[in-house]
Amino acid sequence: MTVRPEIKAVFFDLDGTLLPMDQSVFAKEYFKGIAGHIAPYGIAPQQMIDFTLAGTAAMVHNDGSQTNEQVFWKTFFKELGEEKEGISEIAAEFYYNGFKALKAQTGENPLACEAVKTAHCNGRKV
């Protein structure tokens, strides 16, 4: 007899699962937004894009000894060649404010709300 482990949580990938979008259009607008937000602080838009991609790649290979945030910023500043004071906070400001504009690049999935509610009603963490 096979014993099935109890499912305690359900993880959804927003990018295309619960939140329909054209990934390439979304990414283009995302990078335009964050690069424009950071540019006045001395990081050229293309540098911001390149360093963000490098940091993201480093997170994919994270061995778990550091948080993804730590790995990202360590890689970002290594690529930049210096550690700029306050850049992580300025980037966070974009996520609190400017990121909302990217909603226009996404669609709605009428089943998304139902899927999340069903998971919650069945005692699962989401």
Predicted regions and their residues:
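Alpha-helical elements of Rossmann-like donor-binding domains used by nucleotide-donor carbohydrate transfer enzymes
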Residues: E29, G33, V71-T75, E114
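A metal-dependent, Asp-based hydrolase signature
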Residues: A54-Y96
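Substrate-recognition element of Asp-dependent hydrolases with the DxDx(T/V) motif
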Residues: I90-Y96, A101-G107, A112-V126
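Active-site neighborhood of HAD-like aspartate-dependent phosphohydrolases
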Residues: T2-F12, T17-F51
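Asp-based, Mg2+/Mn2+-dependent phosphohydrolase catalytic module
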Residues: M1-V10, C113-C121
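A short, structure-level motif marking secondary-structure boundaries and short turns
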Residues: L19-P20, A57-M59, F99-L102
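Glycine-centered loop/turn motif at secondary-structure junctions
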Residues: G42, G81, H120-G123
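Short, solvent-exposed loop/turn segments at secondary-structure boundaries
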Residues: D22-V25, G64, K103
